[in-house]
Amino acid sequence: MFQQLSASIRHNAHIIFLCISWYFISSLASQVTKQVLTVCPLPLFLGEFQFIYTAVLAWFTCYIAYSFPGFYRIFPNGTFPEYYIDDRETSRAARKESKLSSLIIPPSKPILQTVLPLGLFQFVGKYFGHTATSLVPVSTVASIKTLSPMFILLLQKILKISTLKITLTLIFSLCTLVLGVWIIVQEDNRSPASSNELREFSKYGVICAMISMFIFVLQNIYGKTVFTYRSQTDESQSNSGFSRQESPLPLYEKLDEKLVAKKKPKSYDKLTLMIYISLVGFCLSFGWFITLEFPVLFRYFFQINSSSTVIKAFPVSLFLLNGTFHFIQAMITFHLLGEVSTLTYSIANLMKRFAIIAVSWVFIGRRITWLQVFGLVLNTLGLFLYERCTSQSKIKAKIRPE
């Protein structure tokens, strides 16, 4: 048993290393975001900076992948545009000159139709998420985000999308999840300050965190098909019957290939989507930034009525660090999505939330209470049971005859 465990760890060592790096960088990024918004509480400006900085880093990464095949082959298919005819078994890569001669796929109407909703979700979600982070502890924001399964189920029921069957286990998991989040939020917001203004700000921060979580739930439902990449090679293998199945269990259905091809949305590589989504998000939030926060920045830099400004400092290094962490998180996410199953990624993503909560408690420096630990345990149990329900539902769907 121990030999099998050690062999499994050695085989998946790079995945374990990626997950640990993901948790570490995500936790640091959350703390850096909190520090930035504490001294410079401008959520729109931070979002604008993240959008443009992410687009620049993504373009630069595409340039490296375009110029160096070895770097291109490190990442799973669908991370970059198809620069090369990639044969991973023989370690040979040839430039696809006739297919794509530019760094990213040129803008077109289908691309804009795809990224416009995602850019809008990013803009609104970032604004409320950053606002919440500036008002309440990071652990509060992270714990509220773990409520997303409940809202996903609710939206799927409202939109009449195929969803999980309501069972006692599912109900118990959601109740446990809500109770755990409630305990964490209550404990986090026990502030020594007693002013009504701070309490109102705390309540507003919780509301903003809820809105941000709801927006990103909508984004995940919409983006599920957009970020599912299939290259032409994969499609031809699938049509010829040689594609690798997710499960050894047979699928008892036969679909009209022409109908499937007609209904299936066009898929783009993840870096192209990242660049266009960032640019669209930047453009959508630019007007709001100019109206609401640019006057504040203008007064701060030109020392106009500086005594009343909300900006305590302008930490350029923290802005750059925050944007870099934000981009690295996205690249690790893309790599994991191409290396592990959807269920494994979901569990890893949930574990990331717990890491962010735990690290935020350490950074705050306050004594961790037993109620906080109990709330985190309830949160973990609820999410674990929810994932079990999800995986069992998928297995039953695969073996059910049509």
Swiss-Prot record:
GO terms for molecular function: antiporter activity; phosphoenolpyruvate transmembrane transporter activity. Residues 34-50, 125-134, 187-206, 293-353 are extracellular. Disulfide bonds: none annotated. GO terms for cellular component: endoplasmic reticulum; Golgi apparatus; membrane. The keyword Transmembrane helix applies. It is found in: Membrane. The chain crosses the membrane at residues 13-33, 51-71, 104-124, 135-155, 166-186, 207-227, 272-292, 354-374. Residues 1-12, 72-103, 156-165, 228-271, 375-402 are cytoplasmic. Keywords: Membrane, Transmembrane, Transmembrane helix, Transport. It is a multi-pass membrane protein. Belongs to the TPT transporter family. This is Uncharacterized transporter YJL193W.
